[in-house]
Amino acid sequence: MAEQPLADDPSAHRRRLGDDLRRSREALGLTQQQAADQLEWSLSKLIRIENGAHGVSVSDLRSMIGAYRISGQRQVDALMTAARASRAKAWWSPYRDVVPTPFARYLGYEASAVRFRIFHPFLVPGLLQTGEYAAELLKTLPDARRAQLLLELKRERQQRVFAQPGPSFVFVMGEEGLYRWIGGREVMQRQLAYLAEVARRPNTQLRIVPFEAGAYPGMAGPLVLLKLAENGEEVAFLESVGGDELIRDEPATITKYADNFETMVGKSLSRERSETLIRERVEQLGRPEAQGTDSRGAR
């Protein structure tokens, strides 16, 4: 299947625009400091624009077009269009009060990803959580309003990610996620039935790391790896009690996490065995005696 990005997002426009402007600067042989001096800007402002961390006003873009001697009308028009799009509000703007900065930045990358590789050691990954399963998890938060907004954010995020057929997905989860009771038997049964449905999608792999796999690299916490449409670059997103972390422009670090992910895939059951295990667990949860039963041997 050809890899296609998701629908455009302001942060994706910022990154593309930053890359285009950086290439134009480099074509003239200008360093970032030389360009900043010529534009009478701070170096940090130029760096933020080139990194896609900051939108570009039309007036600033005109200054850069002049400084970089960009004369082709088609290129100028494309840059202007991208600059306007880069300053639009992101879809998650209504949730900014409850979204930590690293996750907000991650959402911008997610919107232009062509491949998702996602791992969770003991829960169903967020993109695959049903509404009632997610709601049960969010009940642990002391602020009910925050919990409701996060639930709405998750629902909209899922809809956006799965709205396009282009991206490919590899989900890996620890077998514990099939047995940890979130919301009770019926909630878990519906959640796992949904996982079994997802497992059959042609663009999706869902793999279970069995208990018997023992210890493995990366098992300490959730991990997301995204391959971006713009340039094939990968970014990593990590969740932890100490705070979330988004990693970009650190190839060696991202390679380490990618290697860990592939190790987890290697220790997981095949797609077919994973789906079978999930369906067996769904059937088990449908039996009255399932309440509180550990049936890890039902494979």
Predicted features and spans:
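A ubiquitous short alpha-helical element
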Residues: 45-50, 242-246
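C-terminal regulatory/effector modules of DNA-binding transcriptional regulators
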Residues: 184-299
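Short alpha-helical DNA-recognition segment
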Residues: 28-47
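Interdomain hinge/linker segments and adjacent boundary elements that couple functional modules
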Residues: 2-15, 19, 23, 33-37, ...
